[in-house]
Amino acid sequence: TKKKEIEIKTGKKIHVVAISAKNKNKKRQFKIDKKIFYSNPLKIFKSKKIDILFESIGLSDGISKKVVETALKNKVNVITPNKALIAKHGDYLSKLAEKSKVNLEFEASVAGGIPILRTIKESLATNKINKVYGILNGTTNYILSEMENSNETFDKVLQKAQKLGYAEPGNPKLDLNG
């Protein structure tokens, strides 16, 4: 399982202590233990000791921001692939994480999950980088590659990307605009 793989690579045990989602009864690829399910994610912080929060709600404001903000204020490390949240509130949340002496990790929200931030931070730390040019957006890269390889239209490939989960089903604007 992925859990075991992570435990082997990191040498750390993973204990899922709480899960929250809009719909508890939605069909998923895994079972949710009803004892650790919270319909209101903010209540998790009142009743559980959490080391890391994984946020994947996908909104820039509202509950996404409130959950991440609450976690950071409670000295909980945060991992999020939420592009919209980081684009709009990244500076504020980074400062809050720094103030709380915890990590805010969001590399999966940048460049289609390519570890570009770590590469720039660690491997190119002595270089002065003024600009980065290129398409650093996984959805757009997929669509352009697929259009070229299959000779299908943009709309058809976008629908395919949405079915595969590469682009949001309702409004893929954020996925396409980076």
Describe each PLM feature range.
Residues T1, K43, I52, T70, ...:
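Alpha-helical scaffold segments in soluble metabolic enzymes
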Residues T1-K73:
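N-terminal glycine-/serine-/threonine-rich beta1-alpha1-beta2 phosphate-ribose binding loop
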Residues I14-V16, V78, L104, F154, ...:
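Residue-level detector of short coil/turn "hinge" positions at structural boundaries
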Residues H15, N40, I63, V67, ...:
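General structural feature for long, well-ordered alpha-helical segments within catalytic domains
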Residues D33-I36, A97-K99, E122-A125:
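Short, hinge-like loop/turn segments at secondary-structure boundaries
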Residues F37-S39, F54-E55, V78-P81, L104-A108, ...:
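General beta-strand structural signal in soluble alpha/beta enzymes
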Residues L59-N74, P81-K121:
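Rossmann-fold NAD(P)-binding glycine/threonine-rich loop
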Residues E122-N177:
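Conserved anion/nucleotide-ligand pocket segment
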